[in-house]
Amino acid sequence: MRPERNNISIYNPQWLAGFTSGEGSFGVKVRNPKENSKAFIELIFQINQHVRDKQLIACIAEYLECGNIYKHSLNAVVYRVSKRSDLTERVIPFFIKYPILGIKALDFKDFCSLAELISNKAHYTEEGLDQIIRIKANMNTGRILEG
């Protein structure tokens, strides 16, 4: 079993981008609207880790200056950012400057598209909501790679 580490700091933003490429996720929750009401769309950036790495998760939250840390289970902690202003002013600009690599880069690109659609209030129209749902369906495990 790996021991807990103390005195963890993040000095290299590229390290955080690489760590996120492997351990982070970009997602969206769509809460179905009732008739004649607006859909609720929640964008989420999160990193899950074993509880022994809770100090690392705290350092990531401190480094990005946003988000919350939750105990997910006996053995897991979650760093989550869902506040739109934190996503658009901190998280998205950070990963534009220090790019995500690999397949997760496609999820980040979709995440940015969703943030823009929401910013433009596209989710208040049926067409916009359909577009958001299509993008969501093709993110993460729903992504089909051509090849």
Regions found by a protein language model. Name each.
Residues M1-G147:
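Sequence-level preference for short, compositionally simple segments enriched
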